[in-house]
Every structure is written in structure tokens, then in C-alpha cells.
Amino acid sequence: MTKDNNNNPRYLAVKTLERISDGAYSNLQINNVIDSTKMSEKDTRLFTNIVYGVIQHRLTFEYYVSKLVKHPGKLQNWVKELLYTAIYQMIYLDKVPNRAIFDESIKIAKFRGHDGIRRLVTGVLHKIDRDGLPQITGVNAIEKQSIEASVPVWIIKQLNNQVGKAKTESILKSINQPANQSIRINIKKIEKKALVKELERIGFTVRDSEVAADALVLKDGVAAHTALFKEGFYTIQDESAMLPVQSMDIDGDDYILDTCAAPGGKTTQIAEHLTTGLVVALDLHENKLHKIMENAERMGVSENVDMVSVIICSLVL
């Protein structure tokens, strides 16, 4: 396994999840891994699926591991992430046989840890295979909802107060449905019809978004791993995240402040509508501001973007 680690989707998923749990942006980490490795298209999809799947179901998996391991608080972070990735595959990836999940997970445990960790991982996986996942018991109704839907308790309480218990239950049932792979067309660089043609030419299945005007929904490929993306003809953004800017009546000479701007999806979206105007991106972390400018340069809108650190702003004030 050692010689293939740099292109092993499961091994890379564990490492990526470690970085994300330490505060890194998930999309940036995923894109960095894809760009810096030589994974096949199939392995890239598996890697992306596992990382986003664990993020999506993290609270649920944390509960399971807390019941399957005697002292879960003593586990190293990478061991937790390894167990989460294995559990995700066992539950949600029907086409992957358990023997393959077990074999790969145990190899990673053996490579990264000592024999005790290998035995622990082996024991946990075989226990799940033999007895199934732990039942959710000993918690109140809201805590049970939180674990099942992987949504923090405080959010469920807020939803209950704002929209009522019935609507909250409906939201929680739908919240973990697989998200669309959506992109936002760079209207300064290309027309929708031309972009659709190019995407279909390189193998994507493309449809119009039902949510946002400048969005497309893609299947059968990885949107962040194309020359079209690198050349700034589109950016990756959730459909609903495009709506705030879409609702703005932006004039080309407007000056607009985007607070808490990172990672910059809305900043570049605003800039695409500007000619002589300017959008000022404000964020607490300077390294995140640099990433915004990288995206603005890729999208060809950097002349309409300026960046200000919150720290600098507070010193001036």
C-alpha cells in the first residue's frame, strides 16, 4: 500500500478529513488533493463522495463510534476519521463490498498506526458487520433528531421555535439528500449555450438549474477538475448561495461591501456584474482574502475586487 498512498482515494479521504476537522475549507482541500494527485476519474469520485459523505453525517458517525469503542475520547483524530469513512461506505455505498472496505481500512490502520490500532479497527468493523450499528438510546427527542439527521441540537431548537415541530421534522428528513453538483457560469467570459456545449463535449451530463438563473447542474464528472474551471469559465457554487446576489439590482458602477466574504463565491458573482464599480471583500483572515483574489483572477474580475482585513479595518476605526 505504501507506494500507492498518494493516489489511494480512501487514504487521501482520511488525510483530507483530518485537515478539515482542523479548520481547513472542505472544497479547497478536496480540489488541492485532486489537482496534486493522479487518481483516476473513478477514484476521484470515490474520494469526493467519502469526504463529503463523512462531513454530512459526522454527528451520526460520532455517536456510533462512541458506542462501539470503549474509550472514544482517547482515539487519535485520524483513527476516528478512518472509522467514519468505513462506516459511511458500509451504509451508503451499496456497490462497494464490505470485504473491500474492511481490507482497505485495515491496511490504512496498519500503515499509519501500531498493531493495537489495526486490531481495534478490525474489531469495530467486524462488530458492525455482525451486529449492525448501535441503536440510538438514552437521549431525549431533540438529541435523537440531532444524531439521526447530523444537525446540531441548537439548530433544531431554533427551527422548532421558528417554523414549528412538524416543519422541522420535514426539513430534517430532507436535509441529507445528496446535493447537486452545481456551477455558476461566468457571464463575463462565456454564454450559457456555449458552456453547455463544451461541458457535454468533455463528457458531462448538463441541465439547467431550477433554482438560480446562472447555474448549471452537472453529472458524470468532477467540475473542479477541468480546463474550463481552471480558465475561469465557471466556478463551483451551491445553487441557493447564488440567490442573494441574483436578487440584487446591481449597476455596473456600484460600490458594494461583501462582509465575511470568504471563500468568495458571492464576491466574484457580484464582480461579474460590475464595469467601473468595485466590490470590497471583508474577512477576518488574510489568508482567506488571498484565496478570494486567486478566484477573482481566475474568473477575470480582479479589477473589480478589493480586499480588506477585518483586523486592519478595526485598527483604522
Regions found by a protein language model. Give the residues of each.
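S-adenosylmethionine
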Residues: M1-L317
